[in-house]
A protein has these predicted regions:
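Classical eukaryotic N-terminal signal peptides for Sec-dependent ER targeting/secretion
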Residues: 1-17
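N-terminal signal peptide
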Residues: 2, 17-33
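Glycan-recognition patch characteristic of GH18 chitinases/ENGases
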Residues: 27-129, 209-211, 230, 273-279, ...
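Conserved, mostly hydrophobic/aromatic
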Residues: 66, 103, 139, 193, ...
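Substrate-binding surface in catalytic domains of secreted glycosidases
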Residues: 76-85, 142-294
Length: 378
């Protein structure tokens, strides 16, 4: 795998040797011997996939919180609950392990911010949570951008907090930490903010970017495609200017992207020169670690390389033909979580999404997250 991989592995071992000293100082106030949050996003639809991933597959002993995704709502604040969403065994098994389960609401806010019906949404959520034994709410609004949006976000989080003082209340924010999130005002209402430090790669880029760099690589010819906050280090700095460390969770992806028409890291997609938006568009598609990438690591015509600055892997074709994959493995996941928890002293980490690490038998990335959060060796 080359000298870069060897250097990466050596650094992991050196770091792990130091972790026991720092972890010994941590006092566990969370389940499963953890003093840092490990939050897992879980989409109800994953139990219909092959292999299925549902309540029976979740390793509750490696988590502190679960965000249960799938419910939507409209401009009147009415909830839409899809068939198969309600899983009593999810909540009961999580609670038996001391793990909190939260409703993940958001994506598109469907005009709620201008309809005047936010109290209706809050009331409907409170009724649903009481009926099905949920512990709180995670808001995933992609993305508030205006002063009006910011004021609405503060109002909504305030109403959720008034609705139930015991809620675990959080929201998801892009790594740039823009003013639309109103962090100085909203922090009084939320337990923590989940920083979505991923998707620096994807069809919206013109170059073969890294999905989630731990540190920014200055060799990137197009840093504007994911700036500001284009790395874990950069995003942490932005959010630490507005929030205390314990109120921040750093995101880590269990998925990546395949670029089909480039051969190297940071290459320009040839088709970007004639696409309407100047991006790679349909020359890029996403894949999960467990099903799409794990079995190709140094196999099936692919070779793994490591960016020695960003500290994340990527794959290229052995024969030099087109094909570039940006993803995370257990080394980079461990490093990202360790850096976030123990160097920047954040409150924890979270991932999108639990099922994307699953290969039908094991979850390498979740195990790495848990061990790094504990301060254990890999």
């Amino acid at each position: 795998m080359g000298s870069r991989c060897l250097s990466f592995r050596v650094s992991i071992l050196l770091v792990a040797a130091c972790l026991f000293l720092s972890s010994a100082l941590a006092q566990s106030a969370l389940p499963n011997h953890l003093s840092k949050r490990v939050v897992g996003d879980y989409g109800y639809w994953s139990k219909y996939q092959n292999p299925p991933y549902g309540a029976a597959q979740i390793p509750y002993n490696r988590l502190t919180h679960i965000n249960h995704a799938g419910i939507s709502f409209d401009a009147t604040g009415t909830l839409s609950v899809p068939d198969g969403f309600i899983e009593p065994e999810l909540n009961s098994q999580a609670h038996a392990a001391g793990v909190k389960v939260m409703l993940l609401l958001g994506g598109d806010f469907s005009g709620l911010e201008t309809s005047g019906q936010v109290q209706t949404l809050v009331d409907n959520v409170a009724t649903f949570e009481q009926q099905y034994a949920y512990d709180g709410v995670d808001i995933d609004w992609e993305y508030p951008s205006s002063d009006q949006d910011a004021a609405f976000l503060v109002q909504m989080m305030s109403l959720f907090r008034q609705s139930n003082a015991d809620y675990v209340l959080s929201f998801d924010a892009g790594p740039w930490g823009g003013s639309g999130y109103a962090l100085p005002q909203v922090k009084q209402y939320v337990d923590y903010v989940n920083v979505m430090m991923y998707d620096c790669a994807g069809p919206w880029t013109a170059h073969g970017q890294l999905n989630s760099s731990i540190f920014w690589d200055p060799r990137d010819p197009a840093p504007y495609e994911c700036q500001p906050g284009g790395s874990v280090a950069g995003a942490a700095t932005i959010f630490l200017q507005q929030l205390p460390p314990k109120q921040i969770n750093m995101g880590t992806p269990f998925y990546g992207y395949v670029y089909v028409n480039i051969k190297h890291l940071f290459d320009l997609c040839p088709n970007s020169q004639w696409t309407q938006d100047g991006e790679c568009d349909n020359a890029v598609f996403s894949g999960s670690y467990g099903l799409n990438f794990k079995h190709n690591i140094n196999r099936n015509g692919w070779r793994t390389h490591y960016d020695p600055i960003a500290l994340v892997p990527y794959m290229l074709r052995v024969d030099g033909t087109n094909g570039y994959i940006t993803y995370d493995d257990h080394y980079s996941t461990y490093m990202r979580v360790w850096y976030s928890d123990w160097v920047r002293h954040l409150g924890g980490t979270f991932m999108w999404a639990l099922d994307q690490d699953y290969d039908g038998h094991s979850q390498d990335l979740l195990r790495a997250m848990y061990n790094a959060s504990l301060g254990n060796a890999r």
